[in-house]
């Protein structure tokens, strides 16, 4: 039986497979788990077309395999960022584009709900993959933007 892969690219090795290379494959899987547990990445969004995010099986670095995605670029119109139908995960999405336009995070096909991220705002989005034809994405808007506090204080 050959290896199979999860929607986020983690390799599920078959019993007895990959003699001599399973350690490397396991390390790659652990890196993918680390990325999705708390990894950050910036994703450029172009003005001329929508952006498609994907995952390469057994590879690290895919935008979708990160918990926090910051959208960058200069926009003159709202743009869509699409994901594959089988992705089921939650993300922190920040629209850091210039031009005061929305970024819409949605599944590649179907008429399910999407996550609209207003310029300068951050949302928590849960991609449900709840319907193979019209999957939905639920969102929670944050009251304020996420910032890096380099001077935390206790009891004050």
PLM features per residue range, with description:
Residues 1-9, 14-103, 135:
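Exposed extracellular interaction/assembly regions and N-terminal maturation sites
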Residues 16, 120, 155-156:
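Glycine-centered flexibility sites
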Residues 21-28, 50, 119-131, 151:
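Extracellular disulfide-bonded cysteine-rich modules/repeats
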Residues 47, 142-156:
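Register-specific beta-strand positions within repetitive beta-rich fiber domains
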């Amino acid at each position: 039986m050959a290896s199979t892969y999860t929607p986020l690219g983690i390799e599920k090795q078959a019993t007895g497979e990959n003699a001599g290379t399973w350690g490397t494959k396991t390390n790659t899987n652990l890196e993918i788990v680390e990325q999705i547990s708390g990894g950050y990445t910036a994703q450029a969004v172009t003005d001329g077309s929508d952006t498609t995010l994907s995952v390469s099986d057994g590879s690290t670095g895919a935008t979708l395999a990160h918990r926090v995605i910051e959208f960058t670029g200069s926009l003159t119109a709202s743009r869509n960022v699409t994901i594959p139908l089988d992705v089921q995960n939650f993300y922190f999405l920040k629209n850091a584009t210039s031009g005061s336009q929305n970024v819409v995070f949605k599944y590649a096909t179907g008429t399910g709900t999407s996550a609209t991220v207003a310029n300068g705002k951050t949302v928590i989005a849960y991609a449900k993959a709840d319907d193979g034809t019209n999957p939905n994405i639920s969102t929670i808007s944050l009251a304020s933007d996420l910032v890096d506090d380099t001077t935390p204080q206790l009891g004050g």
